[in-house]
């Protein structure tokens, strides 16, 4: 018989689902009813910081600041010698080469530049380096290209290391080349390249650049007929497309078109949360075709006839995220836009009732999601819990929480909204703490937006903090009626005004 301390433990499944556990042995009632693997595990008490750790960390930060000042000093000395003709070469010299994933990169040569001999070599070396970084860091959570096919397309380029400042200059030039070449191309590779750039801008918090590229991807998707591939709409490809850009001659090409379409729709749905000026997204029909399983997509050769395609709604982590963003979040978008269109006051009894029903619907989906993740863990490989639902709950309800003093509140605060937003923030914080440092370094930039939304809510409702009217931050930061993307330009302006020259240059 287990000791008294262990008899009080809830099983892992009930902990993850946030439900009461009857602590039955060897299986609790929930696990026995649903056929889950019931496991009891003692909670691990994380040790605190070791003695002297904070002082060591402060010393490392000081050393890093000194090194940064040295780098910025060398940068300021070398900036005048940067050839001004290199940027002009992009506009005056025709590019050669072909469009290659994941970046549409062509060499730019100029006989007038004093570095004409080294620039193509550096550009090519940086191109292959960026491609390898993509395959190692981005491909696992942004699976829009077949991994094996992309690996075969990337050659190993052995070249000496490029200085960081030179690499930054070339990287910016490559971004411009991708956008310029995309303006004159209508192909799946163009969509993949723009998606790559858009997620980079997303991670940097450059929402204007992201939304512009997302609009281009949306239009290209329509012109290439990608909604037809996904079974969402009978949109015919544009007659401006060449025939080879439309036809899918292989299963890999067909799957890449499918994944590109769903990635566009998924990012569009996440970004549009809480933005009144953004057009509402439409829910995907039940008969839509979703991406294949992770096992099939990771095969080392072309898909065979025996590989099952698009069997289940929860066949992969990508499919589950698509289901959340395009099906479950669609009612949230429609609800927010209906309030704007009708001019109804948010916070009334009818509004609260409708918002609570949406919250309950998301909670039910989360329970199904947890069960699906357990099935995927047993069948294929583990998947990280999706964080996109957290900003959906926060965005839906944060405007009705207790706003800080100094921020005008049109309606009385709703206790239910306070409780649910705080629970969503705590749940997300618990998931982030369980992630390893290596996972955080290569996680999706889409995770940055939920983290910032939760951190902003924590700061706004904190009891012990600087009053909002006395804070150096813009008052809109504490006004939770604004979405995160709506205040980013104000925060960037605040950073430019108040940050030190060192931080502004980083």
From Swiss-Prot:
Zinc as UniProt keyword: yes
Keywords for this protein: DNA-binding, Metal-binding, Nucleus, Transcription, Transcription regulation, Zinc
Feature: compositional bias, Polar residues: 75-84
Residue ranges for the DNA-binding region feature of this UniProt entry: 11-38
GO cellular component: nucleus
InterPro entries named among the record's database cross-references: TF_fung, Zn2-C6_fun-type_DNA-bd_sf, Zn2Cys6_DnaBD
Pfam families, alphabetized: Zn_clus (PF00172)
Uses, biotech or industry: Notoamides have been shown to exhibit antitumoral activities. Notoamides A-C show moderate cytotoxicity against HeLa and L1210 cells with IC(50) values in the range of 22-52 mg/ml, but the IC(50) value of notoamide D is greater than 100 mg/ml. Moreover, notoamide C induces G2/M-cell cycle arrest at a concentration of 6.3 mg/ml.
Organism encoding this protein: Aspergillus versicolor
Keyword Metal-binding listed: yes
Gene3D superfamilies (UniProt xref): Zn(2)-C6 fungal-type DNA-binding domain
Alphabetized SMART domains for the sequence: GAL4
Function text: Transcription factor that probably regulates the expression of the gene cluster that mediates the biosynthesis of notoamide, a fungal indole alkaloid that belongs to a family of natural products containing a characteristic bicyclo[2.2.2]diazaoctane core.
Protein name: Notoamide biosynthesis cluster transcriptional coactivator notQ'
PANTHER family for the chain: ZN(II)2CYS6 TRANSCRIPTION FACTOR (EUROFUNG), ZN(II)2CYS6 TRANSCRIPTION FACTOR (EUROFUNG)-RELATED
Molecular function in Gene Ontology: DNA binding; DNA-binding transcription factor activity, RNA polymerase II-specific; zinc ion binding
Region feature Disordered, mapped onto this chain: 73-102
Subcellular location per the Swiss-Prot or TrEMBL entry: Nucleus
Taxonomic lineage: Eukaryota, Fungi, Dikarya, Ascomycota, Pezizomycotina
Primary gene name: notQ'
